[in-house]
Amino acid sequence: MAAEPDNHGLGRSRGGLTTKIRLAVDASFHVLAAVITAGQRGDAPVFERVMEKIRVPRVSVGHPRTRPKHVLADRAYSSLQIRPFLRKRGIAHTIPEKRDQAGHRIRRGAAGGRPPGFDREMYKRRHKVECRIGLLKQARGVATRYDKLAVRCQATVQLTLIRQAL
């Protein structure tokens, strides 16, 4: 059986056929990037796609900014691919370590390396993303997700974001 095309963002989940909305939000509740994926897709594999979509216009002349200064993310984004990706691009991050990763590191002893830095006060600011998703889901079209294709769901999300910005 052929794989489902990327623009068909429907995926199986506990609730049936669903899609997920991945957002990048700045400190002022502005959405920098929105990506729609199938419901069963993991968070970590989609992280780079979300980061690539970030475009912030500069006040002066020049190309838009594509690299944030700092990234806050939950445990789902704690993976061996994401931390080096952020380090290579020079982006500071606050991502809690998964419990099983910490256990493996501790079990390996000195060979396990140092734990990644984690700032609890900085992590508390992550609630802005959750609040923005809640605000986005106040729109009936986004909350009910009647759209069958990811491209239509993306359009619904974009229209809702524009309407809320006005």
What are these regions (language model features)?
Residues R49-E52, G134, L161:
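Generic alpha-helical structural context detector
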Residues G11, Y146-C153:
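Structural motif
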Residues T156-L166:
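Charged phosphate-binding loop/patch that engages nucleotide di/tri-phosphates or the phosphate backbone
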Residues M1-V25:
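Active-site-proximal, Lys/Arg-enriched surface segment
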Residues Q40, V59-L149:
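Helix-centered, glycine/charged polyanion-binding patches within enzymatic domains
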Residues I21, V25-A27, V35-A38, E97, ...:
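Short, structured patches in soluble enzyme cores that scaffold and shape functional sites
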Residues V35-V61:
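Active-site beta-loop-alpha junctions of metal-dependent nucleic acid enzymes
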